[in-house]
């Protein structure tokens, strides 16, 4: 029995070595990952059936409790049998592939064993099929719980399946006395050796898969880190400043010997070896880069000649050049250099390809973000441009009437009119202006209106003097005051009062324009400022435009709040958090610069 066990260990060693080689193949790993498809199942059946057939051929032939053949077995004497590791391949295949794969392996391995002959040919064939199905069911049980069977489970299943084979031999092989003698001789060695072999085989597969998963997780983390650190720079587009920072990040995190980024004509950044002659902005791109830009395909170089660097002492002897695209057009290249061709491994190639696709996506997103920002700014300026001085003709008529009676007042009104239009023109070109300028604009407007209706309007200004330099959208207060003067007061109302407040606390700036006019009808109030709509009193376009400008610059929290009571008056207000106001100022500076 000991001698048989030693020889069985040799057979298991053959299968384990084959399993070690197999686990490193891409075909096997892909089959494990895609075992739900017919192709993956077919590959697993083929591989483990081959293992089981090899186990049949390398079995140890036994007759009358004696080892008669220790070489490869191609036929078995009718009174003989073999001790082998066939069940190991059937069981492992079933555990990894499920009942369909296990049954397929069991049928092929069993038919092959049956073809060799011997007193246990039929019982071994039947046990192979049952072992494959049962191992497959056990494997599916674990797979449904999103985990692979452990080596310990594999060992227990191996012991169980081999024990099942011994029972089937006792039940089916004739005469029973010979079957009993055979099982007494081979049972313990085969059960122990197949259990041990199953443990080792699955341990190897799990270790290699775990190692690959760890490597993949590490690469994923590295790529995500690079993406996170480079995204702010690619938002700026493909320029020298952004590319220098990006190249430094890639060089640091990938460990390549040098990294270059180019546009279609010149090197934008080069970090690492060769910086003395790969000079940004002064060096034209190489012929290799031109080919990549022209074809849009990845290219590799494994010699200094293929890199096409003209510097005789350039330390770079291998490179991979990848296209950077935006909206389907190649706009530049990413070049990763190595001092030795050995550094350009498959892992580095896949990393470079992933980074190129990621960077291309970032460039497209940056371009889309820029276009969206420009469109948004254009919309805001278009809304500002709609705030036209509709009272122009009335102001001119008023000034014309005063020319003969009060020349000095006429001169002052003309100056105020010029201030008003100058502010209007400047405001149409800016997203934000200081509050002090807005107040000058408002005072110019009020001077012209009060000249038309002397003594009619009482204007109260409650302005926190500390806020005069804060940046606000142009025409905000003027539009709200103009809206109140035009719509709030009936013609016969004696005291027409408008209050303008600009106050703040530590968190927000509050602006409010209130009047004591006739109020807004309840059926109109809910929609006012949210959309233009025709009515006898106006279209609501001014408030709608102002509301859209505030939301566009500061977000929904800066939207207008309108409250009103009929015959008592209306209050229009909004507030902007200090942080949002600072961000709006930075945004405006970026647009106006």
From Swiss-Prot:
Topological domain (Cytoplasmic) residues are 1-12, 61-86, 139-152, 206-593
Q: Which residues form the Histidine kinase domain?
A: 363-580
Keywords assigned by UniProt, alphabetized: ATP-binding, Cell membrane, Kinase, Membrane, Nucleotide-binding, Phosphoprotein, Transferase, Transmembrane, Transmembrane helix, Two-component regulatory system
Q: Which residues form the GAF domain?
A: 238-363
**One Gene Ontology cellular component annotation held by this UniProt entry:** plasma membrane
The entry's protein name is Sensor protein LytS
The record's principal subcellular location, in a coarse class, is membrane
Is-annotated flag, keyword Heme?
Answer: no
Q: Where in the cell is it found?
A: Cell membrane
Organism, by scientific name, is Bacillus subtilis (strain 168)
Phosphohistidine modification sites?
390
Q: What does this protein do?
A: Member of the two-component regulatory system LytS/LytT that probably regulates genes involved in cell wall metabolism.
Catalytic reaction equation(s): ATP + protein L-histidine = ADP + protein N-phospho-L-histidine
Provide Extracellular-side residue ranges.
33-41, 110-117, 174-184
Q: Which GO terms describe its molecular function?
A: ATP binding; phosphorelay sensor kinase activity
Q: Which InterPro entries match?
A: Bact_2-comp_sensor_kinase, GAF, GAF-like_dom_sf, HATPase_C_sf, His_kinase_dom, Sig_transdc_His_kin_internal, Sig_transdc_His_kinase_LytS_TM
């Amino acid at each position: 029995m000991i001698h048989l066990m030693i020889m069985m260990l040799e057979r298991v060693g053959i299968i384990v070595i084959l399993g070690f080689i197999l686990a490193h193949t891409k075909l096997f790993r892909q089959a494990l990952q895609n075992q739900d498809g017919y192709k993956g199942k077919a590959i697993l059946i083929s591989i483990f059936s081959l293992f089981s057939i090899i186990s049949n051929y390398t079995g140890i032939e036994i007759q009358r409790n004696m080892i008669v053949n220790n070489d490869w077995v191609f036929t078995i004497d009718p009174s003989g049998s073999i001790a082998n590791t066939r069940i190991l391949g059937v069981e492992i295949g079933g555990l990894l592939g499920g009942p369909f794969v296990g049954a397929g392996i069991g049928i092929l391995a069993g038919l092959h064993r049956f073809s060799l002959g011997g007193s246990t040919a039929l019982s071994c064939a039947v046990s192979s099929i049952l072992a494959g199905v049962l191992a497959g069911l056990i494997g599916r049980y674990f797979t449904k719980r999103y985990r692979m069977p452990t080596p310990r489970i594999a060992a227990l299943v191996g012991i169980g399946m081999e024990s099942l084979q011994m029972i089937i031999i006792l039940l089916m092989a004739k005469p029973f006395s010979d079957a009993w003698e055979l099982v007494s001789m081979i049972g313990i060695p085969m059960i122990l050796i197949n259990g041990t072999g199953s443990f080792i085989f699955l341990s190897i597969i799990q270790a290699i898969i775990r190692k690959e998963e760890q490597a993949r997780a590490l690469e994923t983390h590295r790529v995500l880190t690079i993406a996170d650190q480079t995204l702010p720079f690619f938002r700026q587009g493909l320029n020298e400043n952004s590319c220098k920072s990006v190249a430094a990040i890639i060089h640091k995190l990938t460990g390549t010997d040098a990294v270059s980024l180019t546009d279609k004509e010149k090197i934008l950044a080069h970090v690492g070896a060769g910086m003395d002659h790969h000079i940004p902005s002064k060096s034209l791109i190489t012929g290799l880069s031109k080919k990549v830009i022209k074809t849009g395909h990845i290219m590799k170089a494994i010699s200094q000649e293929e890199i096409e660097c003209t510097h005789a002492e350039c330390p770079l002897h291998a490179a991979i050049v990848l296209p950077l695209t935006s909206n389907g057009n190649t706009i530049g290249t990413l070049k990763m250099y190595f001092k030795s061709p050995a550094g350009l491994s498959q892992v580095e190639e896949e990393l470079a390809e992933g980074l190129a696709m990621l960077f291309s996506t970032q460039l497209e997103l940056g371009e889309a973000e820029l276009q969206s920002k420009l469109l948004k700014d254009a919309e805001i300026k278009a809304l500002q441009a709609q705030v036209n001085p509709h009272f122009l003709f009335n102001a001119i008529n008023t000034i014309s009437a005063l020319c003969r009676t009060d020349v000095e007042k006429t001169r002052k009104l003309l100056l105020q009119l010029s201030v008003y239009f100058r502010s209007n023109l400047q405001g149409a070109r800016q997203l934000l202006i200081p509050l002090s300028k807005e107040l000058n604009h408002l005072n110019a407007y009020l001077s012209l209106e009060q000249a038309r209706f002397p003594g009619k309007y009482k204007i109260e200004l409650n302005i926190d003097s500390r806020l005069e330099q804060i940046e606000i959208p142009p025409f905000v207060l003027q539009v709200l005051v103009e809206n109140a003067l035009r719509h709030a007061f009936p013609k016969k109302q004696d005291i027409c009062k408008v209050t303008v407040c600009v106050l703040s606390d530590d968190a927000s700036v509050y602006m409010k324009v209130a009047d004591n006019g006739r109020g807004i009808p309840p059926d109109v109030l809910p929609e006012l400022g949210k959309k233009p709509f025709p009515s006898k009193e106006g279209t609501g376009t001014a408030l709608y435009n102002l509301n859209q400008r505030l939301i566009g610059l500061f977000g929904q929290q800066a939207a207008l709040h309108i409250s009103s009571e009929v015959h008592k008056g209306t209050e229009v207000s909004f507030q902007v958090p200090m942080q949002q106001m600072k961000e709006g100022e930075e945004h405006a500076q970026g647009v106006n610069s």
